[in-house]
UniProtKB/Swiss-Prot annotation:
InterPro entries hit by this protein: Rhodanese-like_dom (IPR001763), Rhodanese-like_dom_sf (IPR036873), SelU (IPR017582)
Record keywords: Selenium, Transferase
Catalytic residue positions: 98
Quaternary organization: Monomer.
Protein name, entry field: tRNA 2-selenouridine synthase
Taxonomic source organism: Shewanella piezotolerans (strain WP3 / JCM 13877)
Catalytic activity from the UniProt record: 5-methylaminomethyl-2-thiouridine(34) in tRNA + selenophosphate + (2E)-geranyl diphosphate + H2O + H(+) = 5-methylaminomethyl-2-selenouridine(34) in tRNA + (2E)-thiogeraniol + phosphate + diphosphate; 5-methylaminomethyl-2-thiouridine(34) in tRNA + (2E)-geranyl diphosphate = 5-methylaminomethyl-S-(2E)-geranyl-thiouridine(34) in tRNA + diphosphate; 5-methylaminomethyl-S-(2E)-geranyl-thiouridine(34) in tRNA + selenophosphate + H(+) = 5-methylaminomethyl-2-(Se-phospho)selenouridine(34) in tRNA + (2E)-thiogeraniol; 5-methylaminomethyl-2-(Se-phospho)selenouridine(34) in tRNA + H2O = 5-methylaminomethyl-2-selenouridine(34) in tRNA + phosphate
EC numbers on record: 2.9.1.3
HAMAP family: tRNA_sel_U_synth
Protein purpose: Involved in the post-transcriptional modification of the uridine at the wobble position (U34) of tRNA(Lys), tRNA(Glu) and tRNA(Gln). Catalyzes the conversion of 2-thiouridine (S2U-RNA) to 2-selenouridine (Se2U-RNA). Acts in a two-step process involving geranylation of 2-thiouridine (S2U) to S-geranyl-2-thiouridine (geS2U) and subsequent selenation of the latter derivative to 2-selenouridine (Se2U) in the tRNA chain.
SMART domains for the chain: RHOD
GO molecular function: transferase activity, transferring alkyl or aryl (other than methyl) groups; tRNA 2-selenouridine synthase activity
Domain Rhodanese, residue spans: 15-138
Length: 365
């Protein structure tokens, strides 16, 4: 009887299409790393997996299989099967995998088939698909010429990238804007999940037939998400285009990003009082994150201005007082740092211009 299995040659199609996948690994494995379109419905919970693994090391495969069957039986087995059936009722074309595409995949497939659901498992499982994605990242620079979008803080680089189909939004994947004030409301992904999502985005970009791979100018770390070494090296060697924007527009944009969006996000998640407190803490922690660069005296001045702006905002609903510390942050910290960094890239710069001019240049080149 032929094995109902999706071959490794299908990895690209599965990942690019966001094909639904049921991940039968234990929750601890799934939490460490998974794929964007996968959902965890385990064959074994964490403790069951640990016991079976210990048995395998001490007594061999058959003893481990027997223990697994004794642990997942009766009502427990039925509960797992019910969860799988609900998933495949919702996603009738989904696949399944375990870590290596081995015993767990085959047993899950067998139980589903006995319940009247015939589901293919993926050859090689998570491990082989993960390796495929690692190779995708390592080969990214050779697949499509990288082009780095630089620009002074507040110039709207992310908004610009999102308006184009030849870009990959690294900050969106990392859930962080890459600066001291760059934290999102939701937590950052694990390093493995960041890499997996990046690789899937690169595969989709390759399929778009874009002329180049447009990426925002980033440090090695975006928050706590580290760019893979080979990928970052490619970025450091790539040509650069520079987005320019007047100060007034930058201040308006940063007031919206640092104040309006963050404040409303915290309020939405935590309610009025707790949300405002969390927003105030976000600003305090962000400025403290650059205390060493600012120096103690200047840091204290920033904190005083921020506290005053928060008091005005809370009492009057007026956010305009925040402009003072944002403008100071640009002049004292971000702009000098940017100038130092862009000077080092001078020989790689191909074009400078505002949003409209940049779109026109990229479309023509």
């Amino acid at each position: 009887m032929p094995v109902n299995m999706v071959s490794a040659s299908e990895y690209r199609r599965i990942l690019v299409s966001d094909h639904p996948i049921m991940d039968a690994r234990a929750p601890v494995e799934f939490t460490k790393g998974a794929f964007p379109a996968s959902r965890n419905h385990p064959l074994m919970e964490d403790e069951e997996r640990r016991l079976v693994g210990t048995c395998y090391k001490q007594n061999g495969q058959q003893a481990a299989i027997d223990l697994g069957h004794s642990l997942v039986t009766g009502e427990i087995k039925q509960q797992r099967l019910d969860a799988w059936q609900r998933y495949f009722t919702k996603h009738p074309d989904a696949y399944l995998y375990c870590f290596r595409g081995g015993l767990r995949s085959k047993l899950t497939q067998q139980w589903l088939k006995e319940a009247g659901i015939d589901v293919p498992f993926i050859e090689g499982g998570y491990k082989a698909m993960r390796q495929f994605l690692i190779e995708t990242i390592d080969n990214a620079a050779s697949q499509n010429p990288m082009l780095i979008l630089s620009g002074i803080t507040g110039s709207g680089k992310t908004d610009f990238l999102l308006a184009r189909n030849d870009s990959v939004d690294l900050e969106g994947i990392a859930h962080h804007r890459g600066s001291s004030f760059g934290r999102y409301h939701e937590p950052q992904p694990t390093q493995i999940n960041f890499e997996n999502a990046l690789a899937v985005a690169l595969l989709k970009h390759q399929d778009s037939q874009a002329k180049h791979l447009l990426l925002e100018d980033e440090s090695f770390l975006i928050g706590r998400s580290a760019l893979p070494q080979a990928f970052y090296k490619g970025m450091q060697q790539a040509n650069v285009v520079v987005l320019e924007e007047p100060m007034e527009a930058r201040l308006t944009r940063l007031l919206n990003e640092y104040v309006h969006k963050m404040h409303s996000g915290y309020i939405q998640r935590l309610g009025e009082e707790a949300g405002f407190a969390a927003f105030a803490e976000y600003l305090a922690l962000s400025i403290t994150g650059i205390k060493k660069r600012l120096g103690g005296k200047q840091h204290d001045e920033f904190q005083a201005i921020i506290t005053n702006a928060l008091n005005i905002q809370q009492s009057r609903g007026d956010t305009s007082a925040h402009i003072e510390w944002i403008e100071l942050l640009l002049s004292k910290y971000y702009d000098p740092m940017y100038q130092y960094q862009i000077d080092k890239k001078a020989e790689r710069i191909l074009f400078k211009g505002d949003h409209l001019a940049m779109h026109q240049w990229l479309d023509a080149n």
